[in-house]
């Protein structure tokens, strides 16, 4: 049904809890709005609480019956991630869908997180890896209590095709290119989502790991990069006509919504828009995965490296339950 799937096909979601990182703007907010209109219970996880409050107020205007809460979560800080996850797990409530959406893009100069990681890899990859692992008990609880499989939805990018993973330089310490660091983070996101799906399959787990990408969406993240060489070149070539190559935020959210709600979305699936070489469109379908993103041994090594860097271990091939290292 992917070729004909639309947001109207989202089923009623009453009783299901969705956590969306970076839900205050862009694709995250657009997805939250569609889910709210289908009666989902939402957790909006945002770094900037002021912007989060504004987004929540706007959401309540557009979907007055929404059940939503705002939580503070800084994915560039393991302290923040651990604090939030501990509070959430203590509530003993199931989490049916985790949408790992937040991200930073093409930071001009190499910047470090509070934990000493390169900002894009630390936020986009390690932050979400740790968050997912620390929330795993809530996903397992949902699996036990619901017949509808819980899902981890990872937002990747067509940018993953433009680079290869440098396992020995994940932090871009040897040389820093703003765009390449972003591309590597998105490649890592996709490889980890695929690796998660394989581990879940081997454990016969009902939980699904699904990836999606928005095409090229006109979001705050994209606009924040508008002083890059790429953006300047595009403006010079196309001026205002560039909009024909960009999804708006609502269109950009469709692959995420498909991955998060469609009964046809599969474990290990990767979905995106189907027009203009996957750059835009209202039609959602299977997205192309670069051959180098399918390297299973490299993905397994990346998973282990993320465990070592974050101190969070889950879906371990030698363990049946989540184990967190003492940092």
Task: Tell me what each language-model feature is.
Residues 216, 273-276, 322-324:
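Short, solvent-exposed turn/loop segments enriched in Gly/Ser/Thr/Pro and often Arg
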Residues 115, 119, 176-180, 240-243, ...:
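Short coil/turn segments at secondary-structure junctions
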Residues 209, 216, 220, 287, ...:
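Mid/C-terminal beta-alpha module of Rossmann-like enzyme folds, strongest
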Residues 295, 299-327:
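Amphipathic terminal alpha-helices
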Residues 185, 236-286, 294-300:
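C-terminal helical subdomain
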């Amino acid at each position: 049904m992917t070729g004909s799937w639309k947001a109207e096909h989202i089923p009623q979601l009453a009783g299901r809890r969705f956590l969306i990182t970076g839900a205050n703007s862009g694709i995250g907010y657009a997805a939250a709005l569609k889910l709210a209109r289908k009666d989902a219970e939402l957790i909006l996880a945002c770094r900037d609480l002021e912007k989060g409050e504004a987004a929540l107020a706007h959401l309540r205007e557009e979907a007055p019956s929404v059940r939503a809460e705002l939580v503070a979560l800084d994915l560039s800080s393991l302290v923040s991630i651990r604090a939030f996850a501990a509070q959430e797990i203590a509530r003993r409530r199931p989490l049916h869908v985790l949408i790992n959406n937040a991200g930073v893009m093409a930071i001009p100069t190499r910047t470090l997180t509070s934990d000493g990681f390169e900002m894009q890899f630390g936020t986009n990859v390690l932050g979400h890896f740790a968050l997912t692992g620390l929330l795993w008990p809530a996903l397992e609880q949902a699996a036990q209590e619901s017949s509808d499989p819980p899902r981890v939805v990872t937002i990747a990018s067509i940018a993953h095709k433009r680079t290869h993973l440098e396992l020995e330089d994940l932090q871009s310490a040897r040389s820093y290119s703003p765009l390449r660091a972003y591309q590597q983070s998105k490649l890592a996101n996709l490889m980890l989502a695929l690796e998660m799906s394989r581990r879940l399959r081997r454990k016969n787990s009902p939980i699904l790991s699904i990836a999606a990408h928005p095409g090229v969406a006109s979001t705050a993240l994209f606009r924040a990069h508008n002083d890059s060489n790429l953006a300047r070149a595009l403006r010079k070539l196309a001026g205002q006509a560039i909009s024909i190559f960009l999804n708006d935020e609502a269109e950009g959210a469709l692959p995420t919504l498909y991955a998060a709600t469609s009964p046809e979305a599969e474990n290990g699936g990767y979905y995106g828009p189907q027009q203009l070489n996957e750059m835009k469109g209202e039609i959602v379908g299977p997205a192309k995965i670069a051959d180098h993103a399918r390297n299973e041994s490299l993905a397994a090594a990346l998973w282990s490296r993320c465990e070592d860097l974050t101190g969070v271990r889950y879906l371990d091939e030698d363990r049946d339950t989540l184990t967190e290292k003492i940092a």
